[in-house]
From Swiss-Prot:
Family that this chain belongs to: Belongs to the RecR family.
PANTHER family: RECOMBINATION PROTEIN RECR
Domain Toprim stretches: 79-174
Keyword Zinc-finger: yes
PROSITE patterns named among the record's database cross-references: RECR, TOPRIM
GO MF annotations in UniProt: DNA binding; zinc ion binding
CDD domains: TOPRIM_recR (cd01025)
GO biological-process terms attached to the record: DNA recombination; DNA repair
Keywords: DNA damage, DNA recombination, DNA repair, Metal-binding, Zinc, Zinc-finger
Protein name from the UniProt record: Recombination protein RecR
Native source organism of the sequence: Geotalea uraniireducens (strain Rf4)
Amino acid sequence: MLHISRSLTKLLGELKKLPSVGDKTALRLAFHLLKSPENLSALAKSLLEVRDGVRFCSTCFGITESDPCHLCTTPRDDASICVVEEPQDILAMERSQAFKGRYHVLHGALSPLNGVTPGQLRIAELLQRLENGSVKEVLLATNFTVEGEATALYLTRLIKPLSIKVTRLAHGIPIGSDLEYVDAATVQRAVEGRSEL
């Protein structure tokens, strides 16, 4: 049996805690880092900087180094809030340059089977933000999964009575794809959500 040092075993254990990192990937990453001590030092420094300097915005719950974050302090459309599941979803929305309003991160999606209930998400904080009356539209940009759909439906039921328009990202066929390779549910939603030209 191969003997691995205690510190390397500990590193492998920590790497395997990352998403999609199993035994082989952890071993490959660890040996890559060991071969280049300067990369290992830079990574360790970056990890410490993130630990000490990055936090969640107290307004939108996105990731920031200053509180409130840049997206909450710069001029944007205050009448609309886009609700996303995770902080990285803001990056995807911003890359598109299609949304000009504010954001709100739930930090997950409802999943009773996995024990994720409304109280574990940032839903109460969203409702507090909607109380002042300046928000006219909430765009639900949760993922198109069972959990994301359940979360969108739950939020719609909470927000509609506040006389705020609730919208959902459109479902559709990806640009550049062949119709014959698209699954039936996606085609059905694309047909149901079709628009007039």
